[in-house]
Regions:
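Short linear motifs in low-complexity or flexible loops
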Residues: 216, 225, 233, 238-242, ...
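Active-site-lining helix/loop region of Rossmann-like oxidoreductase modules
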Residues: 6, 129-217
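Rossmann-like NAD(P)-binding element
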Residues: 37-83
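Residues at the starts of beta-strands that form the adenosine-phosphate
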Residues: 2, 25, 46, 133, ...
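Rossmann-fold NAD(P)-binding glycine/threonine-rich loop
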Residues: 77-118, 122-126
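NAD(P)+-binding Rossmann beta1-loop-alpha1 motif at the extreme N-terminus of oxidoreductases
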Residues: 1-39
Length: 267
């Protein structure tokens, strides 16, 4: 696969390195350096990663629309800014939709925007024995297939989240997670129960495990020797872990917002 990367920052380096290891041809270009943005766009005959911050990514893509005609465009940008980690596209089109409007002849797929750049450097990103899932939003099935392959080549599992019109939900999820992780120092994973309990008390909804990318459902409740129902320990543990990570003595660590997906710092 020939992959062009627009941008030379952290996301370009992390994902580009992984794809080179997988045997793909990769060329990254920027505003300065040996390769230009136009050269990278021309090179990416199979896929082009838009590793540029918002709103610059929309302007750059629009300026290269002739070179990007018919290309698969992988958008990893997050429109998050300010001390409250506000979603700057709130109330309007998502970043992915704005890119699609700027380059209407290309096929945009939203992906790789939910994690810190260092997660994409892991080989592979596996947590608690399970590979990381990467939500994808796109309208073209051929483009989605290309990006699914690129996700798997990073060691992750692709998870279809809908068409480009749903990319705004994924971008809003990124804003929420960044707010919880960085702003509140909270364990964001604790806001969601284990899948067996996601549909209420029964836990009997028949969804193939391959679609969930999670273990098969377990009983919702257990019965102790005296016949009293008690909550599954896993659920209780998740509920207790829903607050801040650590205590008041926890050392504060500054985490740049632009480290999540492609953020607000121009590369």
């Amino acid at each position: 696969v020939r992959i062009g990367i627009l941008g030379t920052g952290g996301m370009a380096d992390a994902l580009g390195t992984q794809w080179r290891r997988a045997g793909h041809e990769v060329l990254a270009g920027g505003r300065s350096g040996p390769n230009s943005l136009a050269e990278a766009a021309e090179f990416g005959t199979d896929a082009v990663l838009l590793a540029l911050p918002y709103p610059a990514v929309v302007e750059v893509a629009g300026g290269l629309q002739d070179a990007l005609r018919g290309r698969v465009l992988v958008d990893c940008a997050n429109a998050v800014a300010g001390p409250d980690f506000a979603l700057t596209t709130s109330g309007g089109p998502s970043v992915a939709e704005r890119i699609a409007a700027a380059v209407p002849t290309a096929h945009v797929v939203k992906a790789f925007n939910l994690c810190h750049v260092d997660v994409w450097r892991l080989t592979p990103p596996v947590f608690e024995g399970r590979p990381l899932a990467v939500p994808l939003c796109g309208d073209d099935e051929g483009a989605l297939d290309v990006v699914r392959r690129l996700v798997r080549d990073v060691g992750c599992e692709p998870l279809y989240a809908g068409g480009v019109e749903r990319a705004g939900l994924v971008e809003a999820t990124a804003a929420l997670l960044i707010r919880l992780w960085v702003g509140e120092r909270a364990d964001a994973q604790a806001i969601a129960p284990p899948v067996p309990y996601a549909w209420g008390d029964s836990g009997q909804v028949a969804v193939p495990a391959r679609d969930l990318l999670l273990p098969a459902p377990q009983p919702v409740q257990q019965v102790d020797p005296v016949g009293r129902d008690r909550v599954d320990p896993q659920v209780d543990e998740a509920a207790q872990g829903a607050g801040r990570v650590g205590g008041p003595d926890r050392e504060e660590v500054a985490v740049p917002v632009d480290a999540f997906g492609e953020g607000a710092i121009d590369q």
